A protein has these predicted regions:
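An N-terminal, well-structured beta->alpha segment
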Residues: 2-92, 98-99, 177-197
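N-terminal small/polar loop signature for handling phosphorylated ligands or for N-terminal nucleophile
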Residues: 69, 73-138, 185, 214-275
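Short glycine-rich phosphate-binding loop at a beta-alpha junction
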Residues: 72-80, 104, 198-200, 302-308, ...
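Active-site nucleophile and cofactor-binding loops and adjacent substrate-binding regions
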Residues: 103-112, 281-284, 306-307, 328
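Glycine-rich phosphate-binding loop
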Residues: 124-138, 254-276, 281, 324-365
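Gly/Ser/Thr-enriched, mixed-charge loops and adjacent short helices
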Residues: 139-257
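Phosphate-binding and adjacent anionic-ligand microenvironments
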Residues: 299-415
Length: 415
């Protein structure tokens, strides 16, 4: 559901009617966009500085042009709960329409719901306007074209289209589509809980709050919500469950409520963090051990992909379960591509992106992954602390981030 009425029948967001818009498009030329916003796995920048409404419009034109070139005239669009979202999404959609694409506007939803839309709707292209786990002044675009999540050179192709003015023109149509309810019901129908559980759900004021607590409750769990109101200021903690400091409140709540489990989601809901009943943070590579054991038990010989940041203990464990371990490059787009190539049924990254192909679609989905975890734990007589204690742990160095300027980071990487 959109907060702002994007278009009426006669005019676009610039106040132009159809004929005026066609004339304007034929003579319009894109400005020079900062190369720094075109990243390895997405397009991302600081709103009002490197990312403006004008930037969003031209990115929409480029995405639409590329989608049409791939034979996909329909594009789904979603956005997270950031304060800049309503205005930026208008210009993004207008750019897509002016490329000649039709747009299915699915409103304010988690990123996995956008991926879901790109799988179940007529069009297999989609754009998610999201800043993910970044600070409130950021926003960006995660892009699927013709079923492929863009990365690396594919993202640079969009930049080159804009710079060379290699952009299609047309007049598309937009319609609002409710995909969230369908996503909710499909997960609800897929998950079979053996017993109810008491779960603390921390959405970090991110967009997962529109569905995660309600879904987990619908699965039969008692939910204690924590920061589930969508607020683009992220007033309580940074929406990144990969950082232990962001789980302090969740751990305290799990202990005080004597809950069976704590779940935390990042800003756009494509990653999940896990805390046991004892307050132990479960790192994603250990979570993947449990998921791999479960998936391989039904699918002997299945490929299980993990990124290079994960523990080396995954290789012998997956082999011991009867699966085939595959180490791969870090990056959600790269993992999804590898899954398609190999036919893998499960993949995971140390960042908390978990990808299920068994019973699901193969995209990273923190909400579905949380539901699968609840299903597995509900079938075990042991508590979560005991279940994860059975898997080996390592002493590992936390991720070390070196602060550099935005302008210098690419030069440093190329050196």
């Amino acid at each position: 559901i959109l907060d702002i009425d994007i278009l009426d029948e006669d005019q676009d967001i610039f106040g132009l009617d159809t004929k005026e818009r066609e004339t304007a498009m034929s003579s319009a030329k894109a400005p020079n966009l900062p190369a720094s916003i075109f990243r390895a796995y997405d397009i991302r920048g600081v709103v009002g500085e490197s990312l403006t409404t004008e930037t969003a419009y031209w990115i929409g034109r480029a995405i639409g042009s590329e989608s049409l070139a791939k034979g996909e005239p329909n594009v789904s669009v979603g956005r997270d709960g950031r304060l800049s979202g309503p205005e930026l999404v208008q210009h993004l959609i207008q750019g897509l329409l002016d490329s000649g694409c039709d747009v299915s506007d699915i409103g304010m939803v988690p990123t996995p719901v956008l991926y879901y839309a790109a799988n179940i709707l007529a069009g297999k292209s989609g754009v998610m306007l999201t800043g993910s786990h970044n600070p409130p002044d950021y926003n960006g675009f995660k892009i699927v074209i013709a079923g492929d999540t863009l990365a690396n050179e594919q993202i640079q192709v969009l930049r080159k289209r804009i710079e060379s003015n290699d952009l299609s023109s047309g007049v598309g149509k937009v319609e609002q589509v409710d995909v969230l309810e369908r996503y909710f019901q499909q997960i609800r129908g897929d998950i079979a809980m053996a017993r109810p559980m008491k779960v603390v759900v921390d959405c970090g004021n991110g967009v997962a709050g529109v569905i995660a607590p309600q879904l987990i409750e619908a699965l039969g769990c008692k939910v204690i919500p924590l920061y589930c109101e969508v607020d683009g200021n992220f007033p309580n903690h940074h929406p990144d469950p990969g950082k232990p400091e962001n789980l302090v409140d969740l751990i305290a709540k799990v202990k005080s409520e004597k809950a069976d489990l704590g779940l935390a989601f990042d800003g756009d809901g494509d990653r999940v963090g896990v805390v046991t009943n004892a307050g132990t943070m479960i790192y994603p590579d250990r979570l993947l051990m449990l998921f791999a054991k479960d998936v391989v038990s039904r699918n002997p010989g299945a490929d299980i992909i993990f990124d290079v940041k994960c523990t080396r203990r995954l290789t012998p464990l997956i082999s011991g379960y009867g699966g085939r371990p595959v180490m791969w490059k870090t990056g959600h787009s790269l993992i999804k591509k590898k899954m398609k190539e190999s036919g893998a049924l499960l993949a995971g990254e140390m960042s908390g992106h978990i990808f299920f192909k068994e019973r699901w679609f193969g995209f990273d989905d923190g909400i579905y992954s949380a539901a699968r975890l609840l299903e597995i734990l509900s079938q075990d007589k042991r508590d979560a602390e005991q279940v994860f204690a059975a898997f080996p742990g390592d002493i590992s160095t936390p991720e070390i981030n070196i602060t550099v300027t935005e302008e210098s980071k690419f030069t440093i990487m190329d050196a």
